Amino acid sequence: MSLIVDASVAVKWVADEENSSRARALYLADDCMAPDLIIAEVGNAMWKKQRRNLVTAEQMKAAMLALPERLHLFDIAELAQRAAEIAIKLDHPIYDCFYLALAERERCALVSADAKLLAAAKKVKGIEARKL
């Protein structure tokens, strides 16, 4: 099954957090897709964890290598116009709206651990949102 995952899910693939085991099960079982923005978002989250000594520098670098290998990535330039439309309509940060635009376009469920993103997804017709 193809799913759109956001950074809140992908970080759990590479760092031990609440529901990491559920996120890793998705990683192993499903075809996961995301806008390429996810690399920067996960990188920033891992950098913050590395600064707080929650992960090592090696773990951070390994995460950056693993993401493009495991995820089917989509260029955000292709999603930008629709993401902007959604952001304006919902008054929601455009970062999240790239995931919504991709879920809408690909007709795939969006999986997230982010309550605000899931709430926004419910406001876009045709998007199935699933809490991790």
Segments (PLM) and residue ranges:
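Structured helix-beta-strand junction loops
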Residues: 29-30, 67-70, 106, 124
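Acidic catalytic patch
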Residues: 36-37, 59-89, 101
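Phosphate- and divalent-cation-binding pockets in alpha/beta enzyme and binding domains
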Residues: 22, 41, 119-120
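Short, well-structured N-terminal submotif of metal-dependent ribonuclease cores
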Residues: 1-37, 49-61, 125
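N-terminal active-site wall of soluble small-molecule enzyme domains
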Residues: 97
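Acidic, PIN/NYN-like endoribonuclease modules and their adjacent C-terminal/linker elements
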Residues: 1-2, 35, 92, 100-132
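Short glycine/serine- and small hydrophobic-enriched flexible loop segments
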Residues: 44-51, 104-105
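Contiguous, function-dense segments enriched for cysteine-driven chemistry
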Residues: 16, 62, 70-77, 112-118, ...
